[in-house]
Amino acid sequence: MSIVRSDKPFVLAGRTYQSRLLVGTGKYRDMEETRLAIEASGAEIVTFAVRRTNLGQIEGEPNLLEVLSPDRYTFLPNTAGCYDAVEAVRTCRLARELLDGHNLVKLEVLADQKTLFPNVIETLKAAEVLVKEGFDVMVYTSDDPIIARQLAEIGCIAVMPLAGLIGSGLGICNPYNLQIILEEAKIPVLVDAGVGTASDATISMELGCDAVLMNSAIAHAQQPIMMAEAMKHAIVAGRLAYLAGRMPKKLYASASSPLDGLIK
């Protein structure tokens, strides 16, 4: 039985976005390269580490708000560098203060510095507090479908399972768990971490993910601005392929042209 899919808008916290690519601001050579790469990506949502980014609180240093306009981009402050729930909640509150009541946040609570794997126990604790305080929580998590379900039940607006370790570029390590998460999901699912090149982004979208977030894959490319544009097209191609529906896989060949009516 064939499945006919119709596209649906990509909506986060009541706002509709045209681009399904979200990008980070770290690891670039300078702010100018950051600006050019983000422009080339076509992304509308930009994430940054609250604890590592100057939003004007440090005089005399490059200010992200002077490079990327809040009128053009939706900012997604994240809690990168936090290792427990208390620290993560405090960081989100700081982001809200620095951005004049901004409620959209990306929650990350890390387990250790070697793997940067999510500490799901602390993540669940932080998510409960943040949702109660009125934050719109997008949450970095493992590819465990049960944890993803629990985060959705808490009230997170999107789950962001890793495809591979942060900054590893390993690609989609476990597509099967992602498929289970997608089958159960009632909120947007975004691949977060592990993407290394355009084909990884396309595969993520072909699986049915709503969007992909990346930073290292662009910033660490030999030509980041060119890679940013490649990622833009990869996301679109993957989404269209998902909607179109791939052909069935077969063990043996199947001729493109029928044998009936051959010229003899």
UniProtKB/Swiss-Prot annotation:
One of its GO terms (molecular function) is thiazole synthase activity. It is an enzyme of class 2 (transferase). InterPro entries: Aldolase_TIM, Thiazole_synthase_ThiG, ThiG. Pathway: Cofactor biosynthesis; thiamine diphosphate biosynthesis. It is found in: Cytoplasm. The keyword Disulfide bond does not apply. The keyword Transferase applies. Belongs to the ThiG family. Catalyzes the rearrangement of 1-deoxy-D-xylulose 5-phosphate (DXP) to produce the thiazole phosphate moiety of thiamine. Sulfur is provided by the thiocarboxylate moiety of the carrier protein ThiS. In vitro, sulfur can be provided by H(2)S. This is Thiazole synthase. It comes from Pseudomonas fluorescens (strain Pf0-1).
